[in-house]
Amino acid sequence: MAFSTIVVLFVAAVGFGNKISSADTCPEFGEWKPWTECLWYPMQNIYDKMTASCGLPGHRNLTNILPLPPGFTIPPPCGHCSFKTRCRTRPKKEGCYPFDGEREICHEHGDICTIAKLPGIGCGWTVLQEVVKQCLSRPDIPEYMRAGYKKLFHMLPKGHCIEKDNQCKCCCGDYEPNEDGTECVKQQDHQCAPFNEPGDWSECLWFPLADMFKKVQSHCGVEGKPEGLSPSSLAPAGFQIPEKCGFCSFRLKCQSREKKEGCFPLKVDKKSCGAEDCPTCGDVCTLDKQNNSCAFTKAMGMKFWNSFAHKAKESNLAHWRRDGYADLFKFLPYGHCKEVGDKCKCCCHPYEPNEDGTACVVKQYCKSLEEVGGKKQQKDQPESEKKAENMPETTGNASHHQHRHHHGDSSSESHEQHHHHHHH
């Protein structure tokens, strides 16, 4: 839906903002280009209009990022999720983003969105946002690029959905559904403190899940259990945890802020561990089938998120706490497995097994312009600029915009109840 596509879009479309590097000065931006119309789905429509408006090269097919339910229809613009955008550019320089963008929400489209549930994840439509956002967890992305994209992603309007009468009722940004699911209401402004500067990256984390969470708590300085929401192992009986593999091991970087009602005190950033981090980290995972199938990783992910949603509802968790915990749990690796003979060959997002299951390759919509053949690198460009220039298309020509009228770090983070398929 709206919020999810917005992500896919802006990653490459507008998603380059201010300087995030040690570069001393960046060139000035040129004049703003005209505003687009109020953009709306399907995703391809938003992307095409944004790239045309911003004068960005390249084409990407965004129609198959997430399979939709049979008979799914897109509602008219709604939920404060439609938006218009404009762009400006500046000369390329190492360490400086060449594009800048800003967005205005089309509040005239403020009726609550009514959307069909997704198979397996119900009203977790913001899974799309997370799927695209984690294209940036690739270990080969330069650090200043990762920081820049992260900053811009925080400017995206986040989706808030509830289930009502077997349908999803959704709103975006500063608005959330009321209890009856009949209208979008403005959230209370809790005046949350800003987050501290992020700490260092953790070691490469790995299963079992209980050990992983202990290390996360220690690294982030979190005490106690998260109100009964701490995940337990979901692995089938007798499941053998392999060595780190499949880009499924990862590092975390934490940011904290003052505890206050309505303000979740912690957020994390994630980076996959690859071949430079450990000898097997980038190798495809080879796992035994479970019940003669390779679908068990998906089943474990669904079980985890369904359990989380049930516990949150059972304990009547405030939406800002629920969304905050979901935002933390989203860092769990979710994988894609391919059946090869009597084994499962698995890799974790943003990677998937290649055709014969011998290696992990970047998913198509997470590839850079050069990787999809849309652009040739210039031999005389600095290495760091080559990477920076190519990564925009990584997060998929998706939807990454810089939002100047931004919602800030509001009390509510999107709840990515999600089909994380983890290997544990």
UniProtKB/Swiss-Prot annotation:
Biased composition (Basic and acidic residues): 372-390
Keywords assigned: Glycoprotein, Iron, Metal-binding, Secreted, Signal, Zinc
Any one GO cellular component localisation term in the record: extracellular region
Localization (cell): Secreted
Glycosylation: residue positions: 291, 397
Post-translational modification: Glycosylated.
One Gene Ontology term of the molecular function aspect: iron ion binding
Tissue-by-tissue expression: Expressed in larval tissues like cuticle, hypodermis and muscle (at protein level). Note=Not excreted into striated muscle fibers or nurse cell.
Chain segments carrying region Disordered: 372-424
Signal peptide residue numbers: 1-17
Protein role: Binds iron and zinc. May bind nickel.
Entry protein name: Poly-cysteine and histidine-tailed protein
